[in-house]
Structures are given as C-alpha cells and as structure tokens.
Amino acid sequence: MSELSQALTDCGALQFGEFTLASGAKSDYYIDIKKASTNPEVLRLIAKLMAEKMRSEGIQADRIAGVVLGSVPLATALSLETGIPYVMIRKEKKDHGTGKLIEGDLHEGDKVLVVEDVITTAGSSIKAIHTLREAGAEVSYVISVIDREGGGAENLRDVDIKFRPLVKASELVKR
C-alpha cells in the first residue's frame, strides 16, 4: 500500500457502506477526502506528492486552480509547497459581492494546473476547465488525489486534458 493510501485509510477517509456519489452513481465505498484535506499531516503529504507529480511530468504552471469547495485546501497547500499562486473556481456565480466565477488573479495566457480531490466522471473539473479557458487561460493538466475510475480520465482526454491522479480507487480499496 502506498504512503498516500495508508494515510487516507488511517485518517478515516475511506468508508464502506451504501453511498450516492455527486455524479448520481451508487457505490459501496466512499472517499471522504475532506477528512484528508482537514488533516494537516495528510494535506502536507498530498501537496508534496502533487508537487513531485508536477516535477516528474514536467508540468509548468503560472497558476493552480481549485474548484470550490473541496479542492481549495488542496490548491492552497500546493501553492504553499510550490510558491505558485492559486485561483478558486466557483461552480456558479453568486448574486452578491463581485459575482465572479474565478477568485484570485488570473491573466490571459496563464498556464493553469487544475487540482481536484476525487474524480469520478470529471464533470465539475470540465466545467472549471471551460470557465478557465473562457477567461483566456491555458489548461492542459488535472492532478487529483483519487481517480474513482468512473470515466473521468476519458472525459478529460476528450477536452484535451492530461489527467494525473495520485492514486486510483482500485488501489485504495483493495481489502
């Protein structure tokens, strides 16, 4: 078992039972990644592994992007680990404040790495990628903590995104 798989198991992120996922699919296990992203030791490990993935894959980024809410701690931690600024992507505009979909400084032509907690179908990631591209950003990569292997990799490939998970669900849930 990898160091990350062990850390996710130890912090209680991996749960077994009957669950409905954000995609609507049913599952006999659930990965409560917020148990990991609110644990400083596990969050630090995730940031370190994401930074290593960036280096090993040669991923260059001017900005890191996290989708509100679940991916923001990951984007923050990776930003602190790498020194790369981050932006937050809202799922929908708010009717108060600035009403922006993208919070933080983003400039046309910026290379943006999207980070995600768990990818199943990649629906929310693809929406965020479209939002970033409409703002003039270049998005080529998504790094996630978990790939639930629910078609997300293929869906991301369809929008010209290279997907790099830290761990696949099939590796994590081996019992």
Q: At which residue positions do the language-model features occur?
A:
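PRPP-associated nucleotide enzymes
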Residues: 1-115, 119, 123-175
